[in-house]
Amino acid sequence: MKAFLILEDGTVFEGTSIGSKRDMISEIVFNTSMTGYLEVLTDPSYAGQAVVMTYPLIGNYGITPDMESKKAWPDGYIVRELSRMPSNFRCEGTLQEFLEKEDIPGIKGIDTRALTKILREKGTMNGMITTNENYDLEEIGRAHV
């Protein structure tokens, strides 16, 4: 399913929906870790934020017991590529399944490094993840997250 990440400055990224299919508006932040995506998702410091993972392939070792807390905290999740077939003897499921279970909307297939560059140059801003092609840009700027 087609999805969009719309930043409050009007920048639009088109990709594919992952996780929950609900709309999300939140502050967009980034993480440059090469591993530890599950720890990022379960880290309470990301509460109220949508996390951009800059490493290009996420989910390759699936969901393991290595959680920082018992639930996921981010409002949204943004990746370049999501592994469909994790490979790990400790794997208990896929990242896609985890995002769905935790009701976290996300988007894949966008240039996360270009997005990170925008955030570094322009500073903190809100963004929306949606599957609705008739999104309201003004709604993003009005959001108090």
Model-derived features with residue positions:
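RNA-binding accessory domains that recognize and position tRNA/RNA substrates
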Residues: 1-144
